[in-house]
Curated annotation (Swiss-Prot):
Location within or outside the cell: Secreted
An annotated GO cellular component: extracellular region
Record-given protein name: Bacteriocin hiracin-JM79
Keywords per UniProt: Antibiotic, Antimicrobial, Bacteriocin, Secreted, Signal
Highest taxon, organism lineage: Bacteria
Signal peptide: 1-30
Chief location bin: secreted
Gene (UniProt): hirJM79
Role played: Bacteriocin with antibacterial activity against the Gram-positive Listeria, Enterococcus, Propionibacterium, Staphylococcus and some strains of Clostridium, Lactobacillus and Pediococcus. Lacks antibacterial activity against Gram-negative bacteria.
UniProt similarity note: Belongs to the bacteriocin class IIA/YGNGV family.
Taxonomic placement: Bacteria, Bacillati, Bacillota, Bacilli, Lactobacillales
Amino acid sequence: MKKKVLKHCVILGILGTCLAGIGTGIKVDAATYYGNGLYCNKEKCWVDWNQAKGEIGKIIVNGWVNHGPWAPRR
């Protein structure tokens, strides 16, 4: 029984080492976050609209609350 378990552990270890060396081939580009869902790297800029929707909604609500029709006029 112990020999079977040891044999399986060795086989799985060798298989895991081989598969780990293959890699996924996914490249990750470092990007800078500028707020409101805007990201830029050396090549391009893009918007994460899922994040931007929430941020833009906050801006609209805060603007309405602070400067709505009830706000004093100058």
